[in-house]
Amino acid sequence: MNKLKFTDSEQLVSQLNRSSSPTDAISAIAAISASEITETAAISALIQALSYHHAAVATAAVEALVKLAPATVEALITAYRSSTDQGLQAYIIQALAQIGDDRAFDVLAEVVGTAVANHCQGNVRRIAARGLGKIGITTDNPETIHHAIEKLTWALLTPEDWGLRYAAAVSLQEIATPEAKAALQVGLNQEADKVVRSRISTSVEKNLSH
């Protein structure tokens, strides 16, 4: 692998945009990430890399976008809203969920609350639910915390997707406010799936011990 020796941000972005192989693309992404470039062109190039046909490139781009946050958040939200590519949207949700920025709340809540058309979308919903948990434990805004708990409570009690209910239980455990604990107790009382019920029970027990 040829080491990139560019120091100019435009050169790094150009290298990524012109990458002819996954190896070249990953090297360029790593260079942008290491340089901590947060210029619009760099962020745009990283978001475009999420659509690369090689999964390792998209994964590297997600990691870079998370590292360069919060500067990347608005661009990620805009890209999500303007895209109809479910694959691209899934990677964007991964990034936003890991970042856990308040500004992504509406997008993550929307994803959690949409109907499942296939297994892939179901997985994205679970990632979004974990993102709401991240926001719930990092934000200083009581209203945002309340809305996160509301959406996670819905996700815990309503959907047929057991994986989403499981993810909601983990997120509510992390938030651990009285409201979140009450939601977990309700979930424990009504959950029929053994795996999910066990996870909710663990969440309730851990919260009681704190």
Regions found by a protein language model. Name each.
Residues 144-195:
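Ankyrin-repeat and related helical/solenoid repeat scaffolds used for protein-protein interactions
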Residues 10-20, 44-51, 55, 74-84, ...:
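HEAT/HEAT-like alpha-solenoid repeats
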Residues 5-9, 39-43, 73, 104-109, ...:
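Core helices of alpha-solenoid repeat scaffolds
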Residues 1-5, 14, 22-38, 44, ...:
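Structural detector for internal amphipathic alpha-helices that build alpha-solenoid repeat scaffolds
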